[in-house]
Amino acid sequence: MNNEVIMGIDTSNYTTSVALMTVDGQLLANLKAPLPVKEGERGLRQSDALFFHVKNMPSIMDRAKEFLNGKKLVAVGVSERPRNVEGSYMPCFLGGVAAQKSILATTEAKGYSFSHQCGHIMAVIYGAERFDLFSKKFVAFHLSGGTTEMLEVRESGSAFSSQLIGGTEDLNAGQVIDRIGVYMGLSFPAGCELEKAALAYKGKVPRKKPKIKEYAFNLSGLENLAKKMYDDTNDKNLTAAFVFDYLSSVLEDVCNNYEANNGKTVFLFGGGVSSNSIIKNRLKSKFDVVFAEPGLSADNAVGIAALTYRAHNLEK
């Protein structure tokens, strides 16, 4: 029996994540430690996020150790930057890089580095078992609190190359969700609570047509509309349902525009906002879409582990 194991590490602005995988691609562990955010606040400064990653890392590595017992660590991958473009940088990823370098210095494991965004894309491919996407061009949406981008994606080596073709021109989808949630008294991050509120609403959802410029859009208007709706109605469920209906309409419109220009396309959705069942069900009924389970849509290290597995095997 092969006892070799691969590790992935991701230190985003929300979660410290470590994943372990066998050298034949079987997931052993998907470990996460969320970063604490004070009640009423809407996120963390980068310096605070890095501090909490450093604080979280020993305990999450202790949890990982349980899965490493009797096994040999042969490769460690890490997300070292937000996106696969020159100059992409966020201090929070230094926490993961430091952990990886420490492991590489004390073991014979090989090291690999990727972008956080490539990790998200790979996590969805791995979770949905859509490995056929490595042989074709597809469109990926990275929807989170820090990013709302529409990308044309192709395979490049062990990972991906991507071209930014659309997305938000102001607020990110996750930002809007969190701002409205906190405004209504929900805890940060507010996505799960806001989704529960939306699903509890049984009435007709008022619709407001979003303004789309081919593949680009603005979401600050949604924040203003939702806050006014809540001020006028004091109805959390109605407001939550409106928010997710609006976001679904935005994504539906840009997907329609893309297919009008390029023909039938596979649309992949990653990032924490992509775990929302309302958005998923709306788009699933209209397009060829790829979603992963919520645990692989939100920040995780499974995508990084899977990319590391792929890179390690390509070198053999």
Go through the PLM ranges and name each one.
Residues 1-4, 109, 113-138, 307:
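Conserved phosphate-binding catalytic cores of ATP/NTP-utilizing and phosphoryl-transfer enzymes
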Residues 2-4, 8-12, 19, 28-30, ...:
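A short helix-loop
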Residues 17-80, 229:
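Conserved active-site "lid/cap" helical segment
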Residues 62-101, 105:
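Short beta-strand-loop/turn "lid" adjacent to the catalytic site in phosphate-handling enzymes
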Residues 78-81, 144-146, 268-276:
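Glycine-rich beta-strand-to-loop/alpha-helix junction loops that act as flexible
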Residues 90-95, 111-119, 141-143, 168-171, ...:
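Active-site nucleophile and cofactor-binding loops and adjacent substrate-binding regions
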Residues 120-123, 292-316:
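Glycine-rich phosphate-binding/hydrolytic loop that grips phosphoryl groups
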Residues 192-267, 273-284, 288-291, 309-316:
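A contiguous, well-structured pocket-lining segment that forms one wall/lid of small-molecule binding clefts
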